[in-house]
Amino acid sequence: DCDVICMAVGLTPTTELFWQAGAKMQYCPQLCGHVPFRDNTMRTSHPDIWVAGDASGIEEASAAMVEGRIAGFSAAKALGCKVKEESFKEYWTRLDHLRAGEVGEKIRGGICQVLVDGWEA
């Protein structure tokens, strides 16, 4: 079951739903605005909300699509679906390649500010 999927495109993260849900947020200029803290599965501090794409910070569309896969796999796993752990590793490797080099330096710096090791239950 899913109550809401929010999609947005732009140059500023659209994060009002995260604010309203009480997710922990951080202003991060490298990611072009306020974005939610998230773990490596793209889950926010709200246990039922994941973030991906422009809502997690403005970067390339290809990175947004990969983040969407990670968030989707994570949400499916949280609902009890079987998800291969290799899927997470494969998509994180893709993200690392997309964010590599000098071009991705700014994005990597921003992500370091909002990525957490995990959420306490």
Q: For each predicted feature, which ranges?
A:
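Residues forming the flavin
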Residues: 1-121
